Amino acid sequence: LSFRDIHGQPVQLQDYLGQPVVINLWATWCPPCRREMPVLQAAQEKTPDVTFVFINQGESTLHVQHFLAAQELSLDNLLLDSNAHMGQAVSSLSLPTTLFYDAEGRLRNNHLGELSKASLNHALQSIYKESL
């Protein structure tokens, strides 16, 4: 699948192969998504050997930029999926959905709903174990 980053540049998910990847499907209108963003941002900062990819589902660049500024969030690898193709591809029925891939690109875990710090840490351990 191919997406656009916040600057309009095309990005493909296979560009992130080579280390564990956490993909978070989210939207600004989703209260659990909004609540878990600080947890994900903190994990992104504390685990540089894991790539965090945030794929917004169906919203405009401007809307997402305003949300990030208002919430004072700094997310790496922020992608826009204007037609929610990723959600369809992984059969996500609701948001947020978080997918955990090992360094070879194999799905090792997924989480539907809001992630707590503890549940995120547990899922991260599972992709580390699988990558060893």
Predicted regions and their residues:
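A short beta-strand-turn-helix
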Residues: L1-V21
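Active-site acidic short loop of glycosyltransferases
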Residues: L17-Q19, D49, L73-L75, S92
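Hydrophobic beta-strand anchors of alpha/beta hydrolase catalytic cores
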Residues: V22-I23, F52, T98
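Conserved redox-active cysteine motifs that mediate thiol-disulfide chemistry
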Residues: L17, L25-A42
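Structural microenvironment flanking redox-active thiols in thiol-disulfide oxidoreductases
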Residues: R34-Q71, S82-Q88
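Small/polar loops that bind or transfer phosphate-bearing groups
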Residues: L25, I55-N56, L112
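Thiol/disulfide oxidoreductase modules built on the thioredoxin-like
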Residues: F67-S74, L80-Y128, L132
